[in-house]
Regions:
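Extracellular/periplasmic solute-recognition and catalytic clefts
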Residues: 183-194, 219-221, 232-303, 327, ...
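Periplasmic solute-binding protein
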Residues: 1-3, 20, 31, 131, ...
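A local structural motif
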Residues: 128, 207, 223-234, 396-404, ...
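Gly/Pro-rich hinge or "lid" segments in bacterial periplasmic/extracellular proteins
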Residues: 81-125, 129-232, 237-241, 376-377, ...
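Aromatic- and charge-enriched surface segment that lines or borders ligand/interaction sites
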Residues: 1-79, 127, 242-245, 309-319
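Detector for C-terminal structural segments
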Residues: 132-135, 186, 190-191, 195-197, ...
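Short helices/loops that flank or line small-molecule/ion binding pockets
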Residues: 48, 240-251, 258-259, 266-269, ...
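Structural transition elements
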Residues: 180-181, 306-307, 339-386, 408-416
């Protein structure tokens, strides 16, 4: 049985008295704490949650998480097969009558369909049955994929003509029970949230991270939320007007663009970011946090030059990993807002190690209490051992030419691409830039027709599995359309991943992660990249707010 608990990561669940039987067959029971209003007509019930879980299997919804979640929710895959069969019959009949099935398909009511993995116990309680053990499932439940959906709304938006140039769709006019209603929805100009008069109310948190109390973030503990009646999101298309309006107080919060960085932030001798006197005089506050994101530089393992697990290919990738100086990249292109990545896992998540224990020993040394990138001479030695002394093929004498696939976004990218060329030029490697549009770039990655490129990943949920799976062989983008864009495959890494992914956080899981990181660092499927650091500015009248990195 589980209960809801609010943490700094959002709403997650805390297991209570979970029986050992749950190791094989986890029954998760959810209880709606109070009756919640959808409209004045009726309250939220357990069936609304179940209806949405069924929608994950709906062939017209094309849920992006169906493939993954159907491995765990009992009966979801079988439900999808039944729905697909019935939907095919509806489509065939519609096409026979109207000559087309592109628009106006009749509504497919999911209520009559049984789903063994999601059943109602009573009006406000439902059970989800999971195959095996999957601790990360609690994070999925905090995501929109599991938000309750009333069948009435599903039926309403399925009416003929609703989405024919009118944007009368669920995502534009959502139905829910939260503290605010979306009363104005024009993403190109303005979006407005207004207080929901039917909201049940919810107390402000009474506990948080250790520093929250010192920062005054728990001063309103226990008071009923929401505290404000209206939230307005405005889109400013030009950076300078946006920044000036923030300084004048028209906007409450702001990020910091590169052009305004020096006006807002200065660094101490120790490298600590602080506000400039101008910002302090305005009463503006600065908050910083390393994002739960990783930007990385993959090598395509299907490529005959940079891919593969042979010793020579491994040393080639290691040499490039040392040569591409991401400390310099962060300084030049991110105003110092980031930290070099030592592996896939960003700081703040279980599995990430601080200090000397956490460095990538292939790329870094520990010097004077901090990591230091190995000298370029080490990279040149590795390159020679890989069969390319001084950047030339030992057998043919031909210069080594590699390619970087990227999206052509405009002249502003030229300095960044030239920087990549200079990094490989340290090894006398010539880098060709293959710029293309976004769709063609994605097609190249899907088909494995790349050599090197740049990618990023933001956490779906705060668990190391959500980053380590980016190097899991069965997740190969070219082979299975998974998220392993490097198409990296190491049998030992994959075996350890299967052991690690569903373990609870603890010494056993940490030990397995350490072994996986040693393998990945040695194989160097990525040049590792960096974790960005978010900077946010707030005016003095903004309270009870802190960055949420998920």
């Amino acid at each position: 049985v589980v209960s809801w608990k609010r943490t700094q990561r959002g709403i997650i669940m805390e297991a209570l008295k979970l029986p050992k039987k749950a190791q094989k067959d986890l029954n998760v029971i959810f209880e709606s704490m109070v009756a919640r209003k959808i409209k004045k007509e009726r309250e939220l019930t357990a069936e609304d949650f179940i209806y949405q879980i069924k929608r994950l299997a709906h062939p017209r919804a094309t849920s992006p998480i169906f493939g993954h979640i159907s491995e765990y929710v009992e009966g979801l895959r079988e439900l999808a097969q039944r729905l697909r069969k019935d939907n095919d019959a509806i489509v065939a009949a519609h096409r026979a009558r109207y000559g087309s099935a592109d628009k106006g398909l009749p509504w497919l009511d999911l209520r009559p369909y049984e789903l063994s993995g999601a059943t109602a116990i009573d009006r406000y309680t439902y059970r989800i049955r999971i195959k095996g053990k999957y601790p990360q499932f609690m994070y999925w439940l905090a995501m929109p994929f599991f938000a309750p959906i009333p069948y009435e709304a599903d039926r309403f938006y399925a009416q003929r003509g609703m989405n024919q140039g009118r944007n009368i769709t669920f995502d534009w006019y959502p139905v829910g029970t939260g503290p605010y209603m979306l009363t104005e929805n024009d993403p190109n100009a303005r979006m407005v949230l207004e207080r929901n008069p039917n909201f049940r109310g919810e107390p402000y948190p009474s506990h948080g991270e250790p520093e929250d109390e010192a920062r005054g973030l728990l001063r309103d503990a226990g008071k009923m939320m929401p505290f404000i009646d209206r939230v307005v999101f405005s889109r400013e298309k030009e950076g300078i007007p946006y920044w000036n309006k923030f300084l004048q107080g028209y906007y409450d919060r702001s990020g910091i663009a590169s052009d305004n960085f020096d006006q807002a932030v200065q660094f101490s001798v120790e490298g600590q970011a602080t506000l400039t006197p101008e910002m302090e005089a305005k009463g503006i506050a600065l908050s910083t946090a390393v994002a739960t994101s990783t930007f990385y530089f993959p090598f395509n393992f299907l490529d005959p030059v940079v891919g593969g697990l042979s010793e020579s290919k491994r040393k080639l990738r290691q040499a490039i990993s040392i040569a591409v100086d991401f400390e310099e990249f962060i300084s030049i292109f991110a105003n110092g807002r980031g930290i070099p990545a030592m592996g896939p896992i960003p700081p703040g998540l279980f599995g990430y190690r601080e200090g000397e224990a956490g460095i990538n020993p292939v790329v870094y040394e520990w010097v004077d209490g901090k990591p230091k990138r190995k000298p370029i001479a080490v990279a040149r030695k590795l390159l020679a051992e890989a069969g390319f002394p001084d950047g030339r093929d030992r057998k043919t004498g031909q210069p080594l030419v590699l390619s970087l696939d990227t999206v052509a976004r405009g002249p502003g990218d030229s300095s960044r691409l030239e920087w990549y060329r200079r990094q490989l030029a340290k090894l006398n490697i010539h880098l060709e830039i293959r710029a293309t549009d976004w769709n063609r770039f994605q097609e190249k990655i899907r088909s494995g027709n790349t050599q090197m490129f740049f990618m990023g990943w933001n956490a779906d949920y705060p668990d190391p599995e959500n980053f380590m799976f980016l190097l899991n062989g069965p997740q190969s983008r070219a082979k299975t359309q998974g998220e392993n864009s490097a198409n990296y495959q190491n049998p030992e890494y994959d075996r350890l991943f299967e052991q690690m992914k569903n373990l609870d956080n603890g010494p056993e899981r940490q030990a397995i992660i350490d072994r996986m990181l040693r393998i990945a660092r040695e194989d160097a499927p990525w040049a590792w990249g960096y974790h960005p650091k978010d900077y946010a500015l707030s005016h003095q009248w903004v309270f009870n707010s802190k960055p949420n990195q998920i």
